[in-house]
Amino acid sequence: PDSIFIYEHKIGNVPTRKGAYSMTGMNYPKSNAGYPRPDYSVNKEFPQVSEQWLVRSGYEIFSSPAYWDKKVYVGDDSGAISCYSATDGRKQWSFKSDMRIIGTPAADKNVVVFGSADMNIYGLNASNGRLLWKINTEAPVLGAVTIQNGIAYIGGSDHKFRAIDIKSGTVVWSYDGVEGYIETKPLVYDNLVIFGAWDKNLYALDKKTGKEVWKWHEGKPGRFYSAAAVWPVAANGKVFIADPERALTAIDASTGKTVWRTKESMVRETVGLSEDKRRIYSKTMNDSVVCYSATTDFPEKIWASNVGFGYEHAPSMPVEKEGVVFGSTKNGLMFGLDAHTGKVLWKHKVGNSLISTLVPLSKNKCLFTATGGEIGLLVIDYKINKHK
């Protein structure tokens, strides 16, 4: 109780202790002057927002929740994936893998699929957590999962990307041309499955065969500029990404050629698509969210909104639901914007750790997870709005 211990936890390895610091020594002024503390006053400005329920898992959470059939599925740093009631947050069941879970799971047809750093991909019964199948790979599996028409798409760190039948656990196809590891949530668009990796490349594969259709890379060399953390979106024949080079890019979905690319707004690793597929959204690295047209062949900015979240680099995607753009930040702040104007509708702070991509159930309800271990359901009553 009187010390802080520092550990290094490399993926796939046991945590290693690096140091310890006593909490009994006075290493700061007693007045605390000049040392700002976490501020939750924003919640008083927006009383229409509240937490219907909040659960503290006790472990760090690095992924978004998955939602299916009124249930919430969350993987954590202990290697456990747990199922909660979306109504009240009560835990229904928990299944333990051997190492941490980094990627966002997906659930459909009573099967929940996820990857683990223990080098396996799992399929569980979504109702009771019973193991249905397990696929062993050759490296930690950190990628998020997308399920479409009974097929799960997921990338690993073994230079492979797989399509898996979720009922049988059979690998439908495997693409072994990936040069780096994968963390993103794959996009299924028309006949393609699209994903980035930490190897500079954005890949497009035939979703039925796994054959490479095209591979995109533009900009500075080096894997640290890869469009690997962003979850790609697509509409009107174009794929949209944002990368660490602070560029927002539209790519021809058929050819893999760049349609337009702009650094005007200094966005980074976030992109979202409007429900009518006419607009895209992205967070900038300082305070703002921007909106661009998804229909033009040039970068047309529609609006920019000063949300006031400060310096920002969390790869948490903006998501539109029923005319509201839901977003989150590295400092525990969530917000809602008018999708057509960018007007700030609400903000709410639940902690001081990174909030992963939100999962709105409607414009009034939103699931969230935080790196600090929190899982919850946010409720917004738009009839109550005292904010001026």
What does each model-found stretch correspond to?
Residues 10, 85-88, 125-128, 165-169, ...:
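Short loop/turn segments that connect beta-strands within beta-propeller blades
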Residues 12-66, 78, 92-108, 131-148, ...:
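Extracytoplasmic beta-rich repeat domains
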Residues 75, 115, 155, 196, ...:
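Residue-level marker for isolated small/hydroxyl-bearing positions within beta-strands
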Residues 76-80, 84-86:
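Beta-propeller domains
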